A protein has these predicted regions:
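Solvent-exposed, acidic/flexible segments
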Residues: 63-71, 99-103, 133-137, 170-181
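Acidic helix-start/capping segments at beta-turn-to-alpha-helix junctions
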Residues: 83-103
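Surface-exposed short loop/turn segments
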Residues: 19-20, 98-151
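Generic short beta-strand segments
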Residues: 38-41, 123-128, 161
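Short secondary-structure boundary motifs at beta->alpha junctions and helix caps
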Residues: 55-60, 141, 147-195
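A structural "domain/chain start" motif
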Residues: 17-84, 190-196
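Sec-dependent bacterial lipoprotein signal peptides
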Residues: 1-17
Length: 196
């Protein structure tokens, strides 16, 4: 029994040591970033607010989606790390509200809209709550790329493989989605520098 436990511990240590390191952040990154509208490849609209009959018609709540929240959180996290985020109105006008579906389309949209420098493209691949009410976690899988819109080169890339994000105490999906989006963007953009 002891030999089997020791073998499992050794295999776990070796397995953890073989985890590939994340991409290093280039030291010469420009400090101004335009956050493009994130792509949603989940097949679900991922609504945070404006979903119920009451919200839509009585309260006239504007529709808010997970990609909207991710873009907002990305701007906030970038600013906390010393970057200047291009105002969302400027990006919205330049991109005409289009979300890119790939790195190439992100470059094309940025160039067409006259966005120079770096653009951040987020691709949401998986976003699934464990339950429709009282969700305790949301499984999130996405990638983020900082792309030089002039050269078309990806300067930095981060991937979050699908894994649960804890959302304890949240009663509805909208609040759980907000909580998960905040946590994921802080985690994903942390390599870009410490918060200031």
């Amino acid at each position: 029994m002891i030999d089997r436990t020791a073998l499992l511990l050794v295999l776990a240590a070796v397995g953890l040591g073989c985890t590939p390191p994340g991409e290093t952040v280039p030291s010469d990154l420009p400090r101004t970033v335009a956050v493009l509208e994130p792509s949603n490849h989940t097949g679900d609209p991922l609504l945070v607010a404006g979903t119920s009959f009451l919200e839509r018609y009585a309260l006239r709540t504007e529709r808010v989606t997970v990609p909207d929240v991710l873009a907002s959180e990305a701007r906030l996290q970038l600013e906390r790390r010393g970057f200047t985020a291009v105002p969302p109105e400027t990006v919205e006008g330049a991109t005409e509200g289009r979300a890119p579906g790939s790195t190439d389309s992100a470059v094309a949209i940025a160039r067409h809209g006259g966005l120079v420098g770096l653009v951040l493209w987020i691709d949401v691949r998986r976003w699934e709550p464990d339950a429709p009410t009282l969700p305790t976690f949301v499984i999130v899988g996405l990638t983020a790329e900082l792309i030089d819109s002039t050269s078309g080169l990806v300067r930095w890339r981060a991937e979050r493989r699908p894994a649960p994000v804890a959302t304890p105490g949240e009663v509805n999906l909208g609040d759980a989605y907000l909580n998960a989006a905040r946590k994921v963007m802080a985690e994903l953009l942390a390599p870009l520098g410490p918060e200031r």
